[in-house]
Amino acid sequence: MTSPAALSPTPFGRVVTAMVTPFDDSGAVDLPLAGRLARHLVEQGSDGLVVSGTTGESPTLSWQEQLQLLQAVREAVGSDAQVLAGTGSNCTAEAVEATRQAAAAGADGALVVVPYYNKPPQDGLAAHFRAIAEAAPELPLMLYNIPGRTGCSMAPETVAQLMDCPNVVSFKAASGTTEEVTALRLACSSKLAIYSGDDGLTLPMISVGAVGVVSVASHVVGPQIRAMIDAYMQGDAAVALALHEQLQPVFKALFATTNPIPVKAALQLNGWSVGDPRPPLSPLPDDMRSTLAQTMAALRQT
């Protein structure tokens, strides 16, 4: 008889929200609103928050703004949630310094994206992440693979080379396939906690060994995502499947164009004045905003 597969730990909980960065009318980062939004997300079921990730518009934030955001969110949620700082860069020295600063500022972890644009080979990726891990050994790291944005994919075998770094504890899988989860588990065993990086694939990924999700949609449907994951983990696959299917229209609407354009519009529709994205991103077009509003209204009726 086959023994049950070992399940991975959950270093950052089950639902981690990749937070938007609020801007005021002048385009400056709205730190007080970031703190209020962070508290709201925790109250809606988030175990953890990522600041200054993809959804947080890290490419158009200065390092100083990113550090200020981290400090504001850390202060707002206290010990009620894990706070991860986006510290990735396509320059190893920059990523090392940002990760050190995040650790000193009280982050519970760092989300470190695969270097973008310069397309390093696999040995370069291994050296890059090892340097970051060794620079802040006290800070747990979540490696982040999103080849659709970076133009470079980190192979499971490369991740396995880093399993001797005690603080390489988790991986955000955003390649768009469940096969990545299986390949990572086979290469790294259950030691590595894998998080879905795609809201629509959360349930399929959990079914093959992921532990949770780094979510965009949890800004507006956090309780439902929490309920879906909890139902599956408690053995009620039918309830989890029903929630998965119920949420698909929202997931589709939130990714109808480049993230975080739609989710910022969704928050605005819910009364959160988070501002529009910074250029070169643009506001959500009126037709997409109308579709998004209709989708959210329909979900509230279910």
Swiss-Prot record:
Catalytic activity: L-aspartate 4-semialdehyde + pyruvate = (2S,4S)-4-hydroxy-2,3,4,5-tetrahydrodipicolinate + H2O + H(+)
GO cellular component: cytosol
Domain of life: Bacteria
EC annotation from Swiss-Prot or TrEMBL: 4.3.3.7
Active-site residue list: Y144 (proton donor/acceptor), K172 (schiff-base intermediate with substrate)
GO terms classed as biological process: diaminopimelate biosynthetic process; lysine biosynthetic process via diaminopimelate
Enzyme type, top EC level: lyase
Site feature Part of a proton relay during catalysis, where: T54, Y117
Binding positions (pyruvate): T55, V214
Molecular function per GO: 4-hydroxy-tetrahydrodipicolinate synthase activity
Pathway linked to the protein: Amino-acid biosynthesis; L-lysine biosynthesis via DAP pathway; (S)-tetrahydrodipicolinate from L-aspartate: step 3/4
Primary location recorded for the protein, binned into one broad class: cytoplasm
Subcellular compartments: Cytoplasm
Keywords for the protein's UniProt record, in alphabetical order: Amino-acid biosynthesis, Cytoplasm, Diaminopimelate biosynthesis, Lyase, Lysine biosynthesis, Schiff base
Family, as annotated: Belongs to the DapA family.
General function of this protein: Catalyzes the condensation of (S)-aspartate-beta-semialdehyde [(S)-ASA] and pyruvate to 4-hydroxy-tetrahydrodipicolinate (HTPA).
Quaternary structure annotation from Swiss-Prot or TrEMBL: Homotetramer; dimer of dimers.
NCBIfam families the UniProt entry points to: dapA
Protein name: 4-hydroxy-tetrahydrodipicolinate synthase
